[in-house]
């Protein structure tokens, strides 16, 4: 299997790529796009734009992940209405976003992105608080590709 190859050949570049954990390559800290439920659409767009990932996590007052907003969500909202001035993050977010643990292999993250047709996964801890994000482009840059 792919996992066996990575374990047997850890020194080679292929082995390194195959054995990379999400924790080793995820975007962390201040670079994670995050807004709270009451954030205005204007500030949400600014957060998505400034972090350059095409998405943002939405958290509640305790810091728990409650949703995600993507560029696509914003486009779909604008297709419905141009009256967006008073809309908050909680009103436009997708609830129950796809998440992943930092302990998984990066190759598994790629499989999940392909399975759900998404470009990023939020890395959460055991209490569902965001601790990172992983983007498809980062996986491709590492040389990971689908089977």
Positions of PLM-derived features:
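The conserved cystathionine-beta-synthase
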Residues: 35-52, 59, 78, 99-118, ...
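Cyclic nucleotide-binding regulatory module and flanking cytosolic helices
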Residues: 3-26
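Phosphate-binding active sites in nucleotide-utilizing proteins
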Residues: 43-92, 103
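Short, surface-exposed loop/turn motifs that are enriched in glycine and acidic residues
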Residues: 11, 30-38
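Structural motif
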Residues: 31-33, 55-57, 66-68, 90-91, ...
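Short beta->alpha transition motifs characteristic of CBS
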Residues: 1-10, 53, 65-79, 118-119, ...
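Bateman (tandem CBS) regulatory domains
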Residues: 20-32, 86-97
């Amino acid at each position: 299997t792919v996992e066996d190859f990575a374990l047997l050949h850890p020194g080679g570049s292929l082995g390194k790529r195959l054995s990379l954990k999400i924790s080793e390559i995820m975007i962390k800290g201040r670079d994670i796009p995050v807004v709270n439920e009451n954030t205005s659409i204007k500030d949400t767009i600014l957060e998505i734009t400034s972090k350059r990932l095409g998405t943002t996590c939405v958290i509640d007052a305790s810091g728990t992940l409650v949703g995600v907003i993507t560029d696509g969500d914003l486009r779909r909202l604008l297709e419905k209405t141009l009256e967006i001035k008073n809309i908050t993050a909680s009103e436009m977010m997708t609830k129950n976003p796809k998440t992943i643990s930092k302990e998984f292999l990066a190759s598994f993250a790629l499989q999940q992105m392909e399975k759900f047709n998404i470009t990023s996964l939020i890395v959460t801890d055991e209490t569902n608080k965001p601790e990172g994000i992983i983007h498809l482009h980062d996986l491709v840059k590492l040389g990971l590709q689908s089977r």
